[in-house]
Amino acid sequence: MPEKINYENLKPSEARQLIREGVLTGPTAGIALGYTQANLVMLPKELAYDFLLFAFRNPKPCPILDVTDVGSPEPKGVAKGADLRTDIPKYRIYKKGVLEAEVNDIRDYWRDDFVAFLLGCSFTFEKALLENDIPVRHIEEGKNVPMYITNIETRPAGIFHGYMVVSMRPIPQNLVVRAVQVTSRFPSVHGAPVHIGDPKAIGIASLDKPDFGDPVEIKAGEVPVFWACGVTPQAVAMKSKPEIMITHSPGHMFITDLKDEMLAC
């Protein structure tokens, strides 16, 4: 991906256009800073209520920002005129729980019975962390945020069940409390951390081997801090095995027209 710094000040519509044209194909952290990014889950209508209930019961990993009309790829509530078939840098196609393909455009997979869910993403509060002089390591290193499948069980709904996925950011020990305070203001994009410290306590064997994304350096004096993550539905798909589920590829988000501060409380 071209240097992110050139894209920090893009308007969301400009970023989506570059994504649609295939200019931006990598992770979206640091792009159109100040605007809310979202995870995608796309399912047939017959499974949509089950997933809606799953998200309602699991608001930390699955905070809903918008739900499309059946058969419409336009998320009218958060980005009028956008097209969820083309405006995400990379998609994943799961069939019966198996990752079948990663693609840059899902028009060939589109069905008229699809319903799309957009879920809050922790990339949204990273601008607030940076403004409080709290480092965001994956942005510093030009990597995708590391994500891990935990032993934290989600509340099941219909066919959907499985374990929570978390994202991890190393935070200097003296800034951990401030990081909790800052992110607590954004409950619509995962909010406060779900765990601080020992990764083994939540079933993570090694921080060097994330299940999704890239490992990042943890420096002396830093503490791993874990936030609920919108990649959770992908781990759930692997266990629940729906006929088909289309998602974003981890770290490759949909950029909405919502300003981050609109979601702050």
Curated annotation (Swiss-Prot):
Tell me the GO molecular function terms: lyase activity
Q: Per its UniProt record, what InterPro entries does this chain match?
A: D-Glu_cyclase (IPR009906), Putative_hydro-lyase (IPR038021), UPF0317 (IPR016938)
Q: Which EC main class describes this enzyme?
A: lyase
EC number(s): the record gives: 4.2.1.-
Q: Which UniProt keywords apply?
A: Lyase
One matching Pfam family is D-Glu_cyclase
HAMAP family recorded: Hydro_lyase (MF_01830)
Q: Which NCBIfam families match?
A: PRK05463.1
The Swiss-Prot or TrEMBL record describes its family as follows:
Belongs to the D-glutamate cyclase family.
What is the name of this protein? Putative hydro-lyase Teth39_1160
Give the taxonomic lineage as stored in the record.
Bacteria, Bacillati, Bacillota, Clostridia, Thermoanaerobacterales
